[in-house]
């Protein structure tokens, strides 16, 4: 059984919802799944003033534990075409894991969100891939086997690089069912590959 970590940062709850959908998919494929978040970098005062969703039940991860998993699925919103600094800051602390090769051969994957359809979803996930490769991880995306990517009948996130959701400029749009299905598919896809590699 593969051990999968869904590691996320979510300011307003969109990525949190996607993270639990990813976890649901991984569990459906037989994985043992942990959902954890990275630490917030802004003060509680600023978070409250900005209406961040601060009541997230997922525990905060530690860098040291990342090597305990067969797969890590990273999730964070897009900030000006790149990953939110909270996740980037956490990842930038993994030098000791890199030095010991703790993530070599593990599966890495990512999902994201943006305010608009062309708000940097692909560039955000693509920006995470070099980090995974530097760690020696096996990168897995969201293949077109997930047919939900193919239609143009509704606004939706998702690409071969990973699942995503579009929040709207004011954050009022929540992940749609097809976006959550994409997240579930990606979680299951990662879990199956991780199980094969862990054998």
From Swiss-Prot:
Its EC number is 1.6.5.2. The keyword Ligase does not apply. It is an enzyme of class 1 (oxidoreductase). Disulfide bonds: none annotated. InterPro entries: Flavodoxin/NO_synth, Flavoprotein-like_sf, Flavoprotein_WrbA-like, FMN_Rdtase-like_dom, NQO. FMN binds at residues 10-15, 78-80, 113-119, 134. One of its GO terms (molecular function) is flavin adenine dinucleotide binding. GO terms for cellular component: membrane. The keyword Transmembrane helix does not apply. Its cofactor is FMN. NAD(+) binds at residue 12. This is NAD(P)H dehydrogenase (quinone). The lineage of its organism: Bacteria, Pseudomonadati, Pseudomonadota, Alphaproteobacteria, Hyphomicrobiales.
